[in-house]
């Protein structure tokens, strides 16, 4: 599944490794798609991708917002966190243990979301 996530991620962010800090895609009729590069360690990136909506207060709220680790050498990517209006979920606890059920669920969601982004015409370059 991690290789498929990587392939779909690169479809919507083909120049992922050359983007300095952030990027944004606008597709008519759909919410903007945002990218932030959080950390670089050689061939491994930690990124955040999100949609934002405008709250009645005027604040821009990310929903959803996911952090992902991307390994260029292995051509893999996996979900690390998920946040929306209802809460925050983390795959790995502070002691490094993995919630495998949550990991599977978030990776499935990420696959679907990346496919939807592509079908909506989103691309960050």
Q: Where is each model-derived feature located?
A:
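N-terminal secretory-pathway/extracellular module detecting exported/lumenal segments
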Residues: 1-63, 72-125
